[in-house]
Design a protein with these regions (language model features):
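Conserved acetyl-CoA-binding loop-helix of GNAT-fold acetyltransferases
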Residues: 100-103, 109-122, 148
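Conserved GNAT acetyl-CoA-binding A-motif
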Residues: 124-137
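Conserved active-site tyrosine of GNAT-family acetyltransferases
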Residues: 145-147, 151
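C-terminal "cap" of GNAT-fold acetyltransferases
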Residues: 135-139, 149, 156-178
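Helix-turn-helix
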Residues: 142
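Acetyl-CoA-dependent GNAT
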Residues: 10-11, 18-94, 99, 104, ...
Length: 178
């Protein structure tokens, strides 16, 4: 398995052919006044061909605008990826946005998300970020992943980065070696 930063030449129309976005969501966190409560839900998150085409264009746009796509490959198949924007923001320009981190269904719960996250952190540090900003989908599994790796509630909230009304705004403090 290889994890690498993608270049424009790595992006092609068939790159998501084997990527399986399928996810059954049975519980999500919802904000109730000042607390988060777990609620039962029932829906499927998946990508059709149009959504995959959209994602490929999104990858190209990201790279062209100075951001990064980190891809994980099994042989030649893209099985996981993350997207970080290329510009700093926040009151002290301390944040960089991690706007996507997805693992193909067959490869989840095997440590791949954590491995990609480590690479994301290294790349964010190279861009002089102090923290990752994550507007996370509120699915129980997604929040459990981010909390397990050390994410905390975001100290600053950026409404323009919230994709869905129930997203949980998180941050991760990056570690700089001395």
């Amino acid at each position: 398995m290889e994890i690498k930063q993608l270049k424009i030449s790595d992006i092609h129309p068939n790159m998501l052919n084997y990527f399986n976005r399928y996810q059954e969501v049975t519980q999500c966190w919802r904000r109730n006044e000042n607390n988060w409560v777990l609620e039962d839900v029932s829906y499927i998150r998946d990508w059709d061909e149009n959504k995959k085409k959209w994602a490929i264009n999104y990858f190209l746009q990201c790279i062209e605008q100075g951001g990064m796509i980190i891809g994980a490959f099994d042989e030649y198949n893209l099985i996981g990826f993350a997207k970080i924007d290329g510009k700093l923001f926040g009151s002290l320009n301390q944040y960089i946005n991690l706007s996507l981190l997805l693992i193909s269904n067959e490869y989840r719960h095997k440590g791949l998300g954590s491995r990609i996250f480590v690479t994301v952190c290294e790349k964010a540090i190279s861009l002089n970020a102090k923290k990752l900003y994550i507007s996370a989908h509120s699915a129980k599994d997604a929040i459990a992943f981010y909390k397990k790796i050390g994410c905390k509630d975001a100290q600053e909230i950026f409404q323009e980065l919230i994709d869905e009304p129930n997203d949980w705004e998180l941050e991760y403090e990056l570690c700089y070696s001395r």
